[in-house]
């Protein structure tokens, strides 16, 4: 029992501290600009299609109105078309297409060279098993956009949108992302107890939510039960893994650690390029074109990411980049919390009667610290530092979430310019937007040699969104009407989403169990086909209802 003494308590305390920081990082804002608040992200609420589509994807065809059309992101893509290119589709379509490729490149680059690396290092430093890392690190990292979207939707009175967003994202991850991971990495084994536990807990949570939705009302104790159920799930995961660690005497074998270190080195050396080289013979034309384009922005993107995401490894340490991290990392976090604390918020600094904007004060303080670091620190640290790994993890999540939001806005603008139907946009572009980060991150983790962690994250992440994200939002709403119940309306689209979500979960449980807990590639193809069927059925329902 010595293993569950001081080291276990210390690691648990560090993990709880990290969770608290990330929850504050994601949930203290009400309108985070990097997570676009699109009511049609799931488009299971067809009433929103006709009433709100104009405010989302149909700005007036003028430069002035397009500038006033706030898409909640960094770049206003409609202004590019109406103001810069003077409504010339010959220029707008290629530029927006290139921007979409750029967004995908940054997503893949961030996930493979930073997120998967620091997640592996952080799990290793905290002695977390793949399951423990999945229910904490991957769930928090992948689920942040959907948690925010759910809270914002229900606080705005759009309960149907909140349910639809969670269910469509859950179906996307449990069907399409799991299928993609299976197609890429299969066949690979999964731990029988952990897999059955994760899927069963997710099934129970989905069935409980389905029951509550069909009842048409929810009480505050039921909403609290959602959040409490996930806390119980995390505790159960830790209890199971701690018991396994005591029996084995260690959480991760030395061989696995050596493999992870080797994979980290391979990723840092540029696994994205090697992956493209492996697949180039299959799709030579596409990859040759994409490779030519990506080489043009490889250096600028790498420099930008290195300026904002610290490198934990001493062998990759750079005095210039580490000093730049001290300046830019606080600014990125400050930008994320812009709605909570305005960048131009006046504060007294140095002199009582002098009011300076917050961003200027932060710039002065971080620049001073960066200059001090640059002049004092001459040698890299001898070992990897846990605070640096934590900051790198948070900044990787920041970039994945930010670029996923920009990709969503750019795709929505391109679809509007191509005059695609709003229902089709909602069921494809807007439904996939915030889940692109899940796809890229989980596939990157699988590519880093940990498909079991990626598989666990595919179930723990959506369950975190459902129980913590939607549960927290429902707690707020039910508390406002306590002791009465919060009323829920019926919509056939949400029932269809429940059905496909339950089909994907029960199918994975049966097929993988039948395959002796090895994930077969054919099941990945079936899951992708299941999601395609869900998209078509939902599109038909949305069109008929409209």
Swiss-Prot record:
Q: Which PANTHER family match?
A: CATION_CALCIUM EXCHANGER 5, NA+/CA2+ K+ INDEPENDENT EXCHANGER
InterPro entries tied to this protein: CaCA_antiporter, NaCa_Exmemb, NCX_ion-bd_dom_sf
Alphabetical keyword list: Antiport, Cell membrane, Ion transport, Membrane, Potassium, Potassium transport, Sodium, Sodium transport, Transmembrane, Transmembrane helix, Transport
Task: Tell me what organism the protein belongs to.
Answer: Arabidopsis thaliana
Q: One GO MF term, please?
A: antiporter activity
The UniProt entry's sequence similarity note says: Belongs to the Ca(2+):cation antiporter (CaCA) (TC 2.A.19) family. Cation/calcium exchanger (CCX) subfamily.
- GO BP annotations, alphabetical order: potassium ion transmembrane transport; sodium ion transport
> What's one GO-annotated cellular component?
nuclear periphery
Which gene is transcribed and translated to give this protein?
A: CCX5
Kindly give the membrane topology term recorded for this protein: Multi-pass membrane protein
Q: What name goes with this protein?
A: Cation/calcium exchanger 5
Disulfide-bonded cysteine pairs: these are none
As for subcellular location, the record says: Cell membrane
What is known about what this protein does? Membrane-localized H(+)-dependent K(+) and Na(+) transporter.
Q: Membrane-spanning residues where?
A: 13-33, 88-108, 134-154, 163-183, 194-214, 218-238, 323-343, 356-376, 388-408, 423-445, 455-475, 492-512, 522-542
Q: Which Pfam families match?
A: Na_Ca_ex
